[in-house]
Amino acid sequence: MLVRIRQDIRGLKQISRTSWRHWTSSRKLRRDFRTAQKKGEKIVLDDYGPPVKKPEQGQPLADFSPNLDVKSRKAHFMNHDEYPTIDYSFEVKNPTLSGNYINGLGETEFRPAREIFHTWKFDHPLGKLELLFQAIRTPKEWVALCKRQWNTRRFTGEKAAVQVPVDDPGAMTEKIKAYTVELGSALVGVAPLTEDMVTEELPLDYPYVISFAVKMDRDAALDAPSELAGLTIQAEYRGTDQISAQVAQHIRDMGWDAEAVIHNFMQIPAAVEAGLGELGKHGSLINQELGSMFRLGAIATNLPLVTDSPVDIGVQDFCARCQVCTTNCPPHAIFDTKQMVRGRERWYVNFDTCIPYFVENHGCGICIGVCPWSEPGRGEGFTLKQMALRKKRAERAEAEAESA
């Protein structure tokens, strides 16, 4: 009981700090932004928030302009006659360090990822955009954020003094998975916690990570970007927070270490290794059953578990030939080919192009809504087709080799 009370007090302090930081840092920007909107003017973000460290000589600058070289289209089933335009209501006169540089685009050696957005550090290179994002939240969005903050109070905590022995890690794994599903998870898997999953700001020393997914409301997702879609996503993230906290507490009650890891943790690499799906061209995970209609959560632990394996459902072959997300993205932020990022070749979304549109519209998510895999019932067919095509290519290559 005392542990729960201390956690509740910590949660109240966290919400108070967040609310005060939000109010004091963004009230002038919020007021001036509304005034500028009424006048039809752009607001200059350089005039707000704490100073941002200038990029060093030779470091690339952020370019927030959209990519106009890509053909545009709009999926007929999205709930918009047209997507919101890319005529932004703000500007930055002194460009800061590129978000792609922070992300490690073009780097051939591995390094841990670095925090880049949703940091609450407004002196960060992308801090001006984040300050605006926080400033223009609607009251409903702000309440939703506070509810999420409340859930963080039980992300960590004290473990029971007596440890439950685990003689059969396989049986324990099934129990933990069943409990996670009982709490509302649609997908769950276990992976070894590797260096690809941690950030410089949150080093973790656990052997395992439990990765899970909460299903998204597809109808709301098809309304993106909108307040409805944003509030629905916040509610879904609140669900991942609650499940993460409860599973972590359940493990700690057995005398083992466990920590809910939501912020500053690389959810997608963990989910890939746990067998939940594959990374798609739009930068999100694709699952055969759910497409990209889910939100991820994770728990790091030393509880002895049996790990799952990555899956191959044909996403890499499919995305190499598909253009749906690249052409539906209004600022065209999605690279059509894989990029080298921190020593790994992978699909990548241009952060400098994506995030201004995300901020302007209080969020986005068009790319995962239009993804063909997200249409119910199509995933298995896509997998079968890709595997058949792959087999034909292999047979053709073998025949050509024999005839050479």
Predicted region positions:
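A residue-identity detector for tryptophan
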Residues: 20-23, 120, 142, 150, ...
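Catalytic cores of enzyme domains
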Residues: 166-170, 177, 181-182, 186-393
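Short N-terminal secondary-structure initiator segments
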Residues: 58-98, 144-179, 234-250
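Flanking helices and flexible, charged tails adjoining ferredoxin-like Fe-S electron-transfer domains
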Residues: 2-79, 86, 340-404
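Short linear sequence elements within intrinsically disordered, low-complexity coil regions
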Residues: 38, 53, 69, 82, ...
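Acidic, low-complexity intrinsically disordered regions
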Residues: 16-19, 116, 138, 252
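Eukaryote-specific, low-hydrophobicity, charge-rich regions
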Residues: 93-186, 345
